[in-house]
């Protein structure tokens, strides 16, 4: 149907249902089949960073061709970060940044990352985190802070962040339904 319910309101003995396509329905009963909700990427927590989203900061890769011949800083230590580091290293300079010393990816992928680091195709920075971002409309460089307090500035065109996904109830949470521990109470 490619239609999402964005709003429901109780009106006397009926429900008014509004969708993202501007359709409106009246129903005597509703069934909410929201599953576990929707998922959103866990975002970088740095004040003001959202202004770079979509132009030089990304939480997913939709078209890898957009990242050709770029200096790319990839944050994360799991399969997504490692897989994209491998793929994008074919045509871009990659800096892989993780808060721990160890990565949590597939063994074969880790082996390939290590090989690429040895030949200079991928630079690995651990254990560290993003400290600041430099740039006006687009990111020009980032500063990372290591666990020992040292900082390092890295010139970069693109920041990719892969810190996993978080569950959101989406619009369901705003419908005014009686909720108990993220579940809807029914009568």
Where are the predicted features?
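Active-site acidic short loop of glycosyltransferases
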Residues: 27-28, 54, 69, 156
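Redox-cofactor binding/interface segments in oxidoreductases and associated redox assembly factors
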Residues: 32-33, 74, 144, 161
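A Rossmann-like FAD-binding core segment of flavoenzymes
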Residues: 1-19, 24-27, 89-186
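Short, flexible active-site-adjacent loop segments at beta-strand->alpha-helix junctions, enriched
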Residues: 5, 14, 21, 29-37, ...
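Flavin (primarily FAD) binding-site architecture
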Residues: 34-48, 165-176
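Glycine-rich dinucleotide-binding loop and its adjacent helix/turn
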Residues: 36-85, 90, 186-187
């Amino acid at each position: 149907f490619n239609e999402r319910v964005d709003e429901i309101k109780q009106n006397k003995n009926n429900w008014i249902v509004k969708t993202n396509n501007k359709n409106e329905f009246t129903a005597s009963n509703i069934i909410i089949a929201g599953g576990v909700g929707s998922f959103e990427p866990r975002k970088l927590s740095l004040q003001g960073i959202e202004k770079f989203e979509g132009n030089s900061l990304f939480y997913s890769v939709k078209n890898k061709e957009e990242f050709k011949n770029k200096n790319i800083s990839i944050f994360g230590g799991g399969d997504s970060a490692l897989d994209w580091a491998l793929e994008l290293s074919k045509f871009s300079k990659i800096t892989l940044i993780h808060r721990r010393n160890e990565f949590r990816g597939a063994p074969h992928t880790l082996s390939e990352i290590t090989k690429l680091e040895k030949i200079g195709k991928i630079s690995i920075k651990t254990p560290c985190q993003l400290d600041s971002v430099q740039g006006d409309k687009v990111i020009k460089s980032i500063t990372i802070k290591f666990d020992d307090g040292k900082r390092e500035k890295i010139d970069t065109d693109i920041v990719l962040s892969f810190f996993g996904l978080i569950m959101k109830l989406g619009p369901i949470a705003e419908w005014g339904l009686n909720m108990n521990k993220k579940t809807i109470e029914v009568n």
